[in-house]
């Protein structure tokens, strides 16, 4: 097969992978824009990761998304790592360059802010503190993005205090760590509230942080998107807050990779959202 006729391949690697909505999303975009290409989900064990990444370009892959548990590991296997991916310590988007080098980026943070700007257009991140629950890879991406858009203070609470303290040491003085038992007491005057934990996800423990101190002017978002309407979002909406579900972050973080692999910047709109939910 010549370079002129090769159909570009992309995909998502992780383990497990059956739950991923990425194939439905990229498949929809390929069809919508009439593009030649395929997007393939691959269940890759940790022990096979290095060999799989080495083989993918030879198989015609131009890049891939990366999900749990490989987002941290691929940083050490990439030749070029963007500053934001290095700061976050994880990559979700790989590009296999023609010179043989693997380029790693993290678009989770920009996906997060794009989701809020689209679905809460009045959001003013500079207007007050942000509360972030959780201290994993998603929290790192969110905190990096919040700092970039000018949030003056970030109040961080995590069930493991040590992980939160480690995150603060990486991101600096804007991040203030609080014990998990205080997770509901740090909401007063917060203008942005973000759950990055798995609490409230299907099959996980329920989200039970008390929201009595929630500022009704706050924008509240939950990165969980299964279910779309989590307990946090239902209670925050009842308190008068603008709420944003987590599906939009998934859609927006995918757009830069799709553009690099297939040459078209895809729209993230209601039609896209409906197609992914229907899959």
UniProtKB/Swiss-Prot annotation:
Which CDD domains does the entry link to? NAD_bind_Shikimate_DH
The kind of enzyme this is, by top-level EC class, is oxidoreductase
Reactions catalysed, as given in the entry: shikimate + NADP(+) = 3-dehydroshikimate + NADPH + H(+)
The processes (GO biological process) annotated in the record are: amino acid biosynthetic process; aromatic amino acid family biosynthetic process; chorismate biosynthetic process; shikimate metabolic process
Where along the chain is shikimate bound? 20-22, 67, 92, 108, 225
Q: In which pathway does it act?
A: Metabolic intermediate biosynthesis; chorismate biosynthesis; chorismate from D-erythrose 4-phosphate and phosphoenolpyruvate: step 4/7
Q: Where does NADP(+) bind?
A: 83, 134-138, 223, 246
GO CC annotation: cytosol
Name one molecular function that GO assigns to this entry.
NADP binding
Indicate yes or no for the key word Oxidoreductase: yes
The UniProt entry's sequence similarity note says: Belongs to the shikimate dehydrogenase family.
Q: What is this protein called?
A: Shikimate dehydrogenase (NADP(+))
Native source organism of the sequence: Cereibacter sphaeroides (strain ATCC 17029 / ATH 2.4.9) (Rhodobacter sphaeroides)
Output the lineage of the source organism: Bacteria, Pseudomonadati, Pseudomonadota, Alphaproteobacteria, Rhodobacterales
